[in-house]
Regions:
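Extended two-metal-dependent nuclease catalytic cores across DNA- and RNA-processing enzymes
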Residues: 22-202
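A short beta-strand-to-loop transition that corresponds to the Sensor-1 phosphate-sensing loop
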Residues: 4-8, 79-82, 98, 305-309
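Long, highly charged low-complexity segments
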Residues: 207-302
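Generic beta-sheet signal
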Residues: 1, 73-75, 266-268, 301-304
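Non-catalytic, usually N-terminal nucleic-acid engagement modules in DNA/RNA processing proteins
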Residues: 1-2, 6, 13
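Glycine-rich loop at the start of a catalytic domain that most often binds anionic cofactors/ligands
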Residues: 14-19
């Protein structure tokens, strides 16, 4: 098992196209701050994390998938990025995390499932992006050619090489022909940007990715983070961990909140069955559940929540 991460540095794609991923919102700091914790957990749990300067996580996945195929192994890629569908093959399956009707689901793609869904082969997914671009990555594509037109063109002609070699012969509206001709350079640039690199300079020895036994520090690490449900799922006994005392057990005087005005901006909330505590402006306040209910329903106040499902049922 390999867990691939992006680095917060430019990649070879930025060198080819300076506007690559331009305008994308920065990753929220509350998420960024959790990456070191996640990586430490993965390390202690026996998994190998992989990062590569100048390359993206997709390139790492593509390189490892090809290496697995070449060594007569099968590969499963778990991702939320549709770009990885170009890596699907008889030996590589993609498990795509998606949301349907507000509920999460995992869709498994092999070549047959991919063709059933999109009517395209894995290599044709790259050609599709060459024409329609990708707004999320700021890949330009051909101006004026959307997903519907691009899908029709690739379904009939399979790749942009054929399209441009036969630009005067292909069966399209003249307006589409003009757009294709005008956007040729961007089409080829977009194909290059959208193609996952399968030769990133990383360790491809499959034996180095065998899951190792849990480190003895894993149990106390998880207990400190109060990952008790996950520990139970993993068969890790909480008794084996020296659990740090909860904040409520620390000798600390909690001041009762008297007025709503004491809570300003973003807050952190801790709740048990009978009471709650709020951290605001580096001060901890104790309050009753009726007050906390009003606080949590206040859309103006930003909250950070763990185990939201349990809280929402109360």
């Amino acid at each position: 098992v390999a867990v691939a991460f992006d680095l917060n540095t430019p990649t070879f794609r930025h060198k080819k196209y300076v506007q690559y991923k331009a305008g994308r919102h920065k990753t929220p700091m509350e998420l960024v701050s959790q990456f070191p914790i996640l990586k430490e957990w993965l390390k202690l749990a026996g998994y190998k994390c992989v990062e590569c300067e100048g390359y993206e996580a997709d390139d790492i996945l593509g390189t490892l998938a090809l290496s697995a195929e070449n060594s007569e192994n099968t590969c499963v890629i778990a991702t939320g990025d549709r770009d990885s569908l170009q890596l699907v093959s008889d030996k590589t399956r993609v498990l795509l995390a998606a949301t349907k009707m507000g509920k999460p689901e995992i869709i498994s793609y092999d070549p047959a499932a991919l063709f059933e869904k999109y009517g395209l082969t894995p290599p044709e997914m790259i050609e599709l992006k060459a024409l329609m671009g990708d707004a999320s990555d700021h890949i330009p594509g051909v101006a004026g050619v959307g997903e519907k037109t691009a899908t029709d063109l690739i379904t009939r002609y399979h790749d942009i090489d054929y399209i441009y070699k036969n630009i005067d012969k292909i069966d399209v509206k003249e307006s589409v022909r003009a757009k294709l001709a005008a956007g040729k350079d961007f089409a080829y640039l977009s194909r290059e940007l959208g193609t996952i690199c399968r030769y990133a300079p990383i360790d491809t020895d499959m034996s180095d990715y065998v899951i190792r036994p849990h480190d003895s520090r894993l149990a106390p690490f998880m207990a400190q983070l109060e990952f008790f449900k996950l520990m139970e799922k993993m068969g890790i006994s909480a008794d084996s961990a020296a659990v740090a005392p909860k904040a409520a057990a620390v000798n600390r005087k909690l001041t009762v909140i008297q007025e709503n005005s004491l809570v300003d901006g973003r807050i952190t909330v801790w709740i048990d069955d009978n009471s709650a505590a709020v951290v605001s402006n580096n001060k901890c306040f104790k309050c009753d559940l009726e007050y906390i209910k009003a606080l949590l329903t206040d859309k103006v106040v930003e909250k950070y929540v763990y185990d939201y499902k349990s809280i929402s049922k109360r």
